[in-house]
Amino acid sequence: MIMAERAVPPRVVAAERVASEAGFKKSCIPEVGRLLRLAAAAKPHGIIAESGTGSGVGTAWLHSGLGAGARLVTVERDEELARRAASIFADDKRVSVLTGDWRLLEQHAPFDVFFCDGGGKRDDPQGVVEQLAPGGLLILDDFTPSPHWPPRFEGEVDELRLFYLTHPALDATEILTTPASSAVVAARRL
């Protein structure tokens, strides 16, 4: 059986172009992007958030699953990247690109989907959890798979990953996105 190549949404292509032009090398990978699209699509009237817009690749994947009644708010601390990412979504009033610290998102919380790829993930994990609505989905990528429990990174217990996987307010799991990378996906308990 021959598999057709999966189409990449046009705004993702535009954001990848911005990343290339800006020399930005930390965009989310397509495997995570498809997960983001699925999460956004699961909350068609939700408030979707992203910390760490970068060039807008993750934002574009979230946008590709955005329902007509949903809103998407993302924040990037680099002014130039935020400006360029905002231009990709300038024609869609459902999307807001903020410039500054990740805490700017708090005024838009609680979130039905939160892709935490920037501020908050490491420096305020409890604050990240508190931004989720009951039943809200949290996606954190850029982990290295670990066959051990508790999970390890570079020979040590990965306290950050362990925090999210065992948090009492979350039902969480780790999924393999590529052979060399994984993501933590969690839902806030009702």
Predicted regions span which residues?
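Rossmann-like AdoMet
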Residues: 1-28, 41-42
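SAM cofactor-binding core of SAM-dependent methyltransferases
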Residues: 24-104
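Hydrophobic beta-strand segment of the Class I
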Residues: 48, 114-117
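Generic detector of well-ordered alpha-helical packing
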Residues: 51, 77, 118, 142-143
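Conserved glycine-rich SAM-binding loop
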Residues: 54, 120-121
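Structural motif corresponding to alpha-helix initiation and N-cap regions
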Residues: 99, 121-122
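A short acidic, Gly/Pro-enriched loop at the edge of an enzyme's catalytic core
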Residues: 107-114
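C-terminal substrate-binding/active-site "lid" region of AdoMet-derived donor-dependent transferases
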Residues: 122-190
